[in-house]
Swiss-Prot record:
Pathway: Protein modification; protein ubiquitination. One of its GO terms (molecular function) is actin binding. The keyword Amino-acid biosynthesis does not apply. Substrate-recognition component of some cullin-RING-based BCR (BTB-CUL3-RBX1) E3 ubiquitin-protein ligase complexes. The BCR(KLHL17) complex mediates the ubiquitination and subsequent degradation of GLUR6. May play a role in the actin-based neuronal function. It comes from Homo sapiens (Human). The gene is KLHL17. This is Kelch-like protein 17. GO terms for biological process: actin cytoskeleton organization; proteasome-mediated ubiquitin-dependent protein catabolic process; protein ubiquitination. GO terms for cellular component: actin cytoskeleton; Cul3-RING ubiquitin ligase complex; cytoplasm; extracellular space; postsynaptic density. Keywords: Actin-binding, Kelch repeat, Repeat, Synapse, Ubl conjugation pathway. Residues 640-642 are annotated as: Interaction with PDZK1. Residues 92-159 form the BTB domain. Residues 1-53 are annotated as: Disordered. Transmembrane segments: none annotated.
Length: 642
């Protein structure tokens, strides 16, 4: 093949005719240069910039400008490729032997994912130079899944593999997989398996799972105590459970029944443990009928002298209610379930010629109000207090007459049940709980203002008269402080009162203490951080927003920040380190607004409003685990009065 002829140099295309013509005249050659100096001749030549390759693009860019490339799929694609290589046995440099199983892998992949393998392959261990390593105390299938996880970052945790996968992940220090196993077990907690999961977590040092499982056992003890797992527990663990202050039980009867069931599951071997177990049952909190009809009748209990002493202690607690303050022990302290939170209940009240039987409750954890079951009787000017895990609505006014009736609210069943009536009709009364007893003082019986007082024992279902106050008081409030009752202010049918008196249950005596700075009836009274607070009320001329505080140590009252709204016929309660002023009347209308006081800042701020306007309302707080009750409407209202 002949080479293609090239156009002669110095020729160009004529722009006019398109035919060859003479090119431009060549420049003359440069004149000869004189010889360079010696130093110049010996200097190394600098390299010339390389001529651009044919077809290359000459870039003109700002100095220092560059572009970073980041492939988000690089790691994924690389590990996918390595996983395929492992499956085909390519470039594998380690074989793991466990039982009869062989697992091929790459040391660098295992060492990069597992601190266990990193130490094995990078330190001066013999395995670092070996191509075959035998592992012990690990399930073969679990190891295979974890090696595969090292390449794919994916693993499925389920009922079929979690019990082998978790210890294997712990051994290899694959904490992410270990946490996934714990999360799965946490989601599977049930009364039938929670004790087993708790033991499994303890055996493998899964502290968070252990705490969660133990909390679940305490919270669901009634159901857990009926399972086979509970019956097989060793004595030490049973003692740990039934002695816990955090046990969630509707009554101490459940603890007693659980203990007896455990003993009778293997009665010959376990009857010797009955005295130790009964010391953990809070017998004084059982009703007298249950003590005599069940505990004293049980042969396993009756035949042990130590158990007889415990039974006598419990009966003495019942027979001497006025001495409960000095008879108190760990067995007389009500249990408080771990995880329970305070719930504020607003009960009854009235608004615009209406008397309410409905009730609502506020959960601070969710900042929501919930409607709960209505009372069987409409009640305004009612006294409300909590004893144990129940709420009591005492007396009041139903729109026709003043009431002696009492009913209690069970938050577990969301129902109200009738209780034994007081000996006297009372509205506008003061009610408070002390040492498991319910006290009612003063009030109005439909004919006269009262100074009498009486006490209710829920364990025996009986009302007993106690010493009368020195002053007749209706629209009075009563609170408990340092083992004593304080009756604050009120109205004696002729004047609004600033006086205060204190009741000491051990001696059954009322005595005067320092009077308030202002006359107040229908005020709110509560105790917070060792001080007695009184807020609002009526002084005979106007509705008040002023607030004062009494210190028993100083024996004097002092003013604190006033409420934002004038209130009387409201109620005051302490909750979560705050004081809550609930409802009431501002002098012209009933209120559904709430405000709360922070003693650390000495300020009142608005809180979420109730559904319903309520004056002459009763308020108390219960510590509840499961709230709200099923099918309860909820409401979140702005922090202003509607």
């Amino acid at each position: 093949m002949q080479p293609r002829s090239e156009r002669p140099a110095g020729r160009t295309q004529s722009p006019e005719h398109g035919s060859p013509g003479p090119g431009p005249e060549a420049p003359p050659p440069p004149p000869p240069q004189p010889p360079a100096p010696e130093a110049e001749r010996t200097r190394p030549r600098q390299a010339r910039p390389a001529a651009p390759m044919e077809g290359a693009v000459q870039l003109l860019s700002r100095e220092g400008h560059s572009v970073a490339h980041n492939s988000k799929r690089h790691y994924h694609d690389a590990f996918v490729a390595m996983s395929r290589m492992r499956q085909r046995g390519l470039l594998c440099d380690i074989v793991l032997h466990v039982a009869a199983k062989e697992i091929r892998a790459h040391k660098v992949v295992l060492a990069s994912c597992s601190p266990y393998f990193h130490a094995m392959f990078t330190n001066e261990m013999s395995e670092s130079r070996q191509t075959h390593v035998t592992l012990h105390d690990i399930d073969p299938q679990a190891l295979d899944q974890l090696v595969q996880f090292a390449y794919t970052a994916e693993i499925v945790v389920g009922e079929g593999n979690v019990q082998t996968l978790l210890p294997a992940a712990s051994l290899l220090q694959l904490n992410g997989v270990r946490d996934a196993c714990c999360k799965f077990l946490l989601s599977q907690l049930d009364p039938s398996n929670c004790l087993g999961i708790r033991g499994f977590a303890d055996a493998h040092s899964c502290s968070d799972l252990l705490k969660a499982a133990h909390r679940y056992v305490l919270q669901h003890f009634v159901d857990v105590a009926k399972t086979e797992e509970f019956m097989l527990l060793p004595l030490k663990q049973v003692l740990e459970l039934v002695s816990s202050d955090s046990l969630n039980v509707p009554s101490e009867e459940e603890v007693y029944r659980a203990v007896l069931s455990w003993v009778k599951h293997d009665v010959d071997a376990r009857r010797q443990h009955v005295p130790r177990l009964m010391k953990c049952v809070r017998l004084p909190l059982l009703s007298r009928d249950f003590l005599l009809g069940h505990v004293d009748a049980e042969s396993l209990v009756r035949h042990h002298p130590d158990c007889k002493d415990l039974l006598i202690e419990a009966l003495k607690f019942h027979l001497l209610p006025e001495q409960r303050g000095v008879l108190g022990t760990s067995r007389t302290r009500p249990r408080r379930c771990e995880g329970a939170g305070p719930v504020l209940f607003a009960v009854g009240g009235g608004s615009l010629f209406a008397i309410h039987g409905d009730c609502e409750a506020y959960d601070t954890r969710t900042d929501r109000w919930h409607v709960v079951a209505s009372m069987s009787t409409r009640r305004a000017r009612v006294g409300v207090a909590a004893v144990g895990n129940r709420l009591y609505a005492v007396g009041g006014y139903d729109g026709t007459s003043d009431l002696a009736t009492v009913e209690s609210y069970d938050p577990v069943t969301n129902t109200w049940q009738p209780e034994v009536s007081m000996g006297t009709r009372r509205s506008c009364l003061g009610v408070a709980a002390l040492h498991g007893l319910l006290y009612s003082a003063g009030g109005y019986d439909g004919a006269s203002c009262l100074n009498s007082a009486e006490r209710y024992d829920p364990l025996t279902g009986t009302w007993t008269s106690v010493a009368a106050m020195s002053t007749r008081r209706r629209y009075v409030r009563v609170a408990t402080l340092d083992g004593n009752l304080y009756a604050v202010g009120g109205y004696d049918s002729s004047s609004h009162l600033a006086t205060v008196e204190k009741y000491e249950p051990q001696v059954n005596v009322w005595s005067p203490v320092a009077s308030m700075l202002s006359r107040r009836s229908s005020a709110g009274v509560a105790v917070l951080e060792g001080a007695l607070y009184v807020a609002g009320g009526n002084d005979g001329t106007s509705c008040l927003n002023s607030v004062e505080r009494y210190s028993p140590k100083a024996g004097a009252w002092e003013s604190v920040a006033p409420m934002n709204i004038r209130r009387s016929t409201h109620d005051l309660v302490a909750m979560d380190g705050w004081l809550y002023a609930v409802g009431g009347n501002d002098g012209s209308s009933s209120l559904n607004s709430i405000e709360k006081y922070n003693p650390r800042t000495n300020k009142w701020v608005a809180a979420s409003c109730m559904f319903t306007r309520r004056s002459s309302v009763g308020v108390a707080v219960l510590e509840l685990l499961n709230f709200p009750p099923p099918s309860s409407p909820t409401l979140s209202v702005s922090s202003t009065s509607l």
